[in-house]
A protein has these predicted regions:
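A short, surface-exposed loop/turn module that caps and links secondary-structure elements
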Residues: 35-64
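Intrinsically disordered, low-complexity regions enriched in polar/acidic and amide residues
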Residues: 21-24, 39, 101
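Enriched for short, Lys/Arg-rich terminal
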Residues: 13, 64-105
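Arg/Lys-rich, positively charged N-terminal/basic patches that mediate binding to nucleic acids
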Residues: 1-32
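Exposed alpha-helical structural elements
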Residues: 25, 44, 95-99
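Residue-level marker for the onset of beta-strands and adjacent loop->beta junctions
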Residues: 1, 59, 70-72
Length: 105
């Protein structure tokens, strides 16, 4: 089941930090995953997150763009079939998980 991808206000700011070519790649990846954003353990394309360095990220999933060095963290709002993008950031250590933890509270 396809979900509607929605960027949070913070994620809209995040994506502007990338150049136009990178923005197209990020948008394309989000659109691809939005076709089936469920966690992989439910047959979807999302990589589920759990506890990362003491941060409870249960219920969140990630998309990894290896060549760009970018992680996209999102949560599903199943009742509305919405895939809400919380963070779009470089894969600098686990910084993206720190940001996701703060924004998800």
């Amino acid at each position: 089941m396809s979900y509607k991808a929605k960027l949070s206000d913070d994620a809209k700011k995040d994506i502007k930090e990338f150049n136009p070519a990178q923005q197209r790649q990020i948008t394309s990846a989000i659109q691809k995953v939005s076709i089936n954003p469920l966690p992989q353990n439910e047959g979807g394309l999302g990589k589920p997150l759990g506890n990362k360095q003491g941060k409870n990220l249960t219920g969140l999933c990630k998309i990894v763009l290896m060549k760009l060095g970018v992680r996209i963290v999102y949560k599903l709002i199943r009742t509305e079939t919405v895939m809400e993008i919380i963070v779009i950031a470089a894969r600098a250590d686990d910084e993206v998980y720190d940001i996701a933890n703060k924004r998800n509270q």
